[in-house]
Amino acid sequence: MAKGGNKLMKLKSVLKKLNSFNTKPNQPPAQTNHSRSSAVSAFPSEDLQTVYVGRTRRTYHVSSDVVSHPLFQQLAAVDGGCGSEDGSISVSCEVVLFEHLLWMLENADADESRPESVYELVEFYAC
């Protein structure tokens, strides 16, 4: 049980860090385009790629900007999920965490990126 509690404490710590630099004063919340079976990024590119997430292989259609993001690349590399024959990507990550990742990428400000937390996030997101 101590191992699970330790992971939970680390996850809370990482989420606090993310929330501290993702909150921007005097800005309305960003609108996202999430649906139950797919999540389309708010990035400008219209080139969508299929991503299968988790044990249930839930289908998401995300922009190439999301797929090319370093955090997404790290997560896919850890899971060995990049590049199948049909161009789809498999990520063995919990669906809720993947949706949080999409939210973070859609709401992140490029000037506020924190590379030191990328590795912590990948460690928690990978199953």
Curated annotation (Swiss-Prot):
Expression across tissues: Expressed in cotyledons, hypocotyls and roots of young seedlings. Expressed in emerging lateral root, leaves, flowers, stamens and filaments.
Inducing factors: Induced by ethylene in roots. Induced by auxin in roots. Down-regulated by abscisic acid (ABA) and paclobutrazol.
Subcellular location per the Swiss-Prot or TrEMBL entry: Nucleus; Cytoplasm; Cell membrane
Gene disruption: observed consequences: No visible phenotype under normal growth conditions.
The keyword Cell membrane is assigned to this record: yes
InterPro entries: SAUR_fam (IPR003676)
Keywords annotated in UniProt: Cell membrane, Cytoplasm, Developmental protein, Ethylene signaling pathway, Growth regulation, Membrane, Nucleus
Single GO cellular component term: nucleus
Region of interest: Disordered: 20-40
Mode of membrane association: Peripheral membrane protein
Gene Ontology BP annotations: ethylene-activated signaling pathway; response to auxin
Protein family per UniProt: Belongs to the ARG7 family.
Annotated function: May be involved in the regulation of ethylene receptor signaling. Promotes cell expansion and plant growth. Involved in the regulation of cell elongation.
UniProt miscellaneous comment: Plants over-expressing SAUR76 display increased root growth and reduced number of cells in leaves leading to reduced leaf area. Plants silencing SAUR76 exhibit increased sensitivity to ethylene, while plants over-expressing SAUR76 display reduced ethylene sensitivity. Plants over-expressing SAUR76 exhibit increased rosette diameters.
Protein name: Auxin-responsive protein SAUR76
Gene source species: Arabidopsis thaliana (Mouse-ear cress)
Gene assigned in the entry: SAUR76
